[in-house]
A protein has these predicted regions:
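Outer-membrane pore/translocation modules
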Residues: 123-134, 141, 156-286, 295-299, ...
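Outer-membrane beta-barrel initiation region
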Residues: 51-183, 190-195
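Outer-membrane beta-barrel "beta-signal"
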Residues: 193, 329, 346-358
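A cross-kingdom marker for long, charged
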Residues: 47-53, 328, 335-339, 350-352
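Long, repeat-rich segments with strong aromatic
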Residues: 280-338, 355-357
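Cleavable N-terminal export/targeting peptides
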Residues: 1-85
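Short beta-strand-to-coil "C-cap" segments at the C-terminal boundary of structured domains/repeats
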Residues: 44-47, 200, 353-358
Length: 358
């Protein structure tokens, strides 16, 4: 731009000098012309031509310094990519953008009602080493209903570590002899589990794993589980646990180790509980679009023939309402579908609906 201005100024100065030189020689000729029209034409010939040259040169100089408009590529602002939170990050509020208020109830484990739950073998006379065998309930039917309600609420945010949250949760699972009219449809067993959970998010820099897997969080907790019944049907235990969760796209894995808090003598309703249900719990989740799938395996690795696996499949009743009612299919095989059945092996399948998810 500066070169263009300098060039224009130099051209103007040169033309001005030429104009002055021409005028000095010819002005006297014009002045001596007596005819008015001829004298005017003489002046126009001298000064008009110079003015035209100056105008054209000035325009050329301006063209030289004309600023070309920027192209779209030069003016385009490249936006920085925005990270999209994964399902796990949203569920546990692992990023600052996903944090929500405290003391608001949200779903924890699946909330469902399975009116048709069929087992291969109903536990009519539960027993344990310290409680003996209960009186048999001969009228119990292999087809019953299964209900679970599970909620959680965040108690503290940024607790002890950056981004870490303290949660409280309560879960209740019932086996209801809904189709047993002979015994007035009793509840065969209900398990209650309050717990405290400490969730610590793991940053991307520390959580990278091979194959694009990412460690998302560490979890620590303490829980009490019992069925609230009197002896000899009483079952209960306390535990602390630790684990971690990883994900990759629509897949997630959660591992947890449960350490039972020991009890003494007759206070222990079920001293061999861990031998049957196991201390390790691994859950694999798959979210392929509208459907969800979760496979949970529990085992102690000391008794591979024990433990259990459970498969949960859901699909929305109305695809336009993803958080509404969902069809729920559940399959179970092994020990410990309920606390009362911790040492009782069975295979079961249940069909119903997931009640709510928020």
């Amino acid at each position: 731009v500066n070169r263009g201005h300098k060039k224009s100024k130099l051209t103007v100065l040169l033309l001005s000098s030429v104009s002055i030189a021409v005028s000095a020689q010819d002005v006297s000729v014009c002045q001596s012309t007596l005819d008015n029209k001829a004298r005017l034409a003489c002046y126009d010939r001298i000064f008009g031509t110079t003015a035209t040259m100056l105008t054209e040169t000035t325009a050329a100089g301006e063209a030289d310094v004309e600023v070309k408009p920027q192209t779209a590529a030069e003016t385009e602002v490249v936006a920085e990519p925005v990270a999209v939170a994964t399902v796990m990050q949203k569920y546990w509020e692992l990023t600052p953008e996903e944090k929500r208020d405290r003391f608001v109830f949200r779903t924890y484990q699946p909330n469902f009602f399975l009116p048709a739950h069929i087992t291969s073998n109903i536990n009519k006379a539960p027993q344990s080493p310290t409680r003996g065998q209960a009186e048999a309930s001969e009228n119990y039917k292999q087809m019953e209903s299964k209900i679970q309600v599970s909620l959680r609420a965040k108690l503290m945010t940024e607790f002890l570590l950056p981004g870490a949250d303290l949660w409280f949760a309560f879960s209740q699972r019932s086996m209801w002899q809904l189709w047993n009219n002979q015994d007035s449809a009793p509840f065969r067993n209900t398990d209650y589990q309050p717990e405290l959970m400490y969730i610590v998010p793991v940053s991307d820099a520390w959580g990278d794993l091979p194959g694009d897997w990412q460690v998302r969080m560490l979890q620590f907790g303490i829980a009490h589980q019992s069925n609230g019944q009197a002896k000899p049907l009483s079952r209960s235990w306390n535990k602390v646990y630790a684990g971690l969760a990883v994900d990759k796209g629509e897949f997630g894995l959660n591992w947890r180790y449960n350490q039972r808090i020991s009890e003494n003598g007759d206070e222990d309703d079920n001293p061999d509980l861990i031998d049957y249900i196991g201390s390790h719990e691994i859950s694999a989740n798959w979210l392929p679009g509208d459907a969800t799938a979760q496979l949970t395996w529990r085992n102690d690795f000391s008794y591979l023939s024990r433990g259990s696996w459970q498969l949960d499949l859901t699909y929305p009743v109305d695809s336009s309402k993803m958080d509404g009612l969902r069809w729920h299919l559940q399959m179970f095989s092994g020990y410990g579908e309920t606390l009362l059945d911790y040492n009782f092996r069975q295979n079961s399948i249940g069909l119903g609906v997931m009640l709510f998810n928020f």
